[in-house]
Amino acid sequence: SGCNFASQGRSNEEIRLADPEETGQGTTAETAANVNEVDPEYYLGETTFIGDSRTNGLLTYQLLPPEQVFAIDGSTQKTIRDDPFIQLGPDSDRLTVEQAVEQRQPHRLVIAFGVNAIPLMTEEEFMQEYDLLIDQLTGVSPNSRIVIQAILPVSGWKYQEMSYLTNENIDHYNRLLKEYSEENSYIFFDISSEFKDEEGNLAREFDAGDGLHFNQNFYQRYIQLLIQYQP
């Protein structure tokens, strides 16, 4: 199927995707697991994405509005926490991720970090900083559903240049993130296999040309997969 979910038992109330008063119907964990139970536009509209330049592509290709994408090029799960870079309106003050999430109270947070952090942190630091970020976000928006996105692959030639960022290494960190998600009852959203070639590297048709970033084909497919699986 190309998708791997890891989640643990949370009650339907805790993973409520939509307010019945807003949509005219209740959405439980069971129905949310079915494809397209929630209207695609509504599903995307109630989701906020937090990440680095790979997440920023959602803005570059105008697939989502700025108030739903909180991302800084080159950032990690640590550096993203302190920078007031988000404007939720033309005249609004610049907010940190924590302040913006507190203000917006999104139904769902999709968090995607990794490629910038792997070379800078030990495994322990990597997981600790991820945990600190999520603690900060759930502290101000306790009803947000947490979706941890698997780190997506890089091209084969890229990691020959950057030996610390092999897809084997990325897979290892994804196993750590999956374990962490299971332990904390978060959703682990792994669509890596959808974007890999036969050798397990980023497939050429999704490569923006630098082996690390993604092209428009990728983001269109990514949105399709989100709508299909609705994590």
Predicted ranges, named:
Residues 112, 116, 138-171:
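Active-site segments of SGNH/GDSL-like serine hydrolases
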Residues 1-46, 59:
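N-terminal, intrinsically disordered, polar/charged segments of Gram-positive cell-envelope systems
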Residues 101, 137-139, 178-181:
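N-terminal cationic-hydrophobic initiation segments that often serve targeting/anchoring roles
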Residues 44-46, 105-109, 141-146, 184-187:
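Loop/turn elements at helix/coil->beta-strand transitions in domains of secreted/extracellular proteins
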Residues 51-54, 62-63, 115, 150-153, ...:
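A mature extracytoplasmic/lumenal domain signature
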Residues 37-129:
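Conserved SGNH/GDSL esterase-like catalytic core that processes O-acyl groups on lipids
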Residues 130-134, 174:
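Generic structural signal for well-ordered alpha-helices
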Residues 154-231:
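Catalytic His-Asp segment of secreted/periplasmic serine-dependent ester chemistry enzymes
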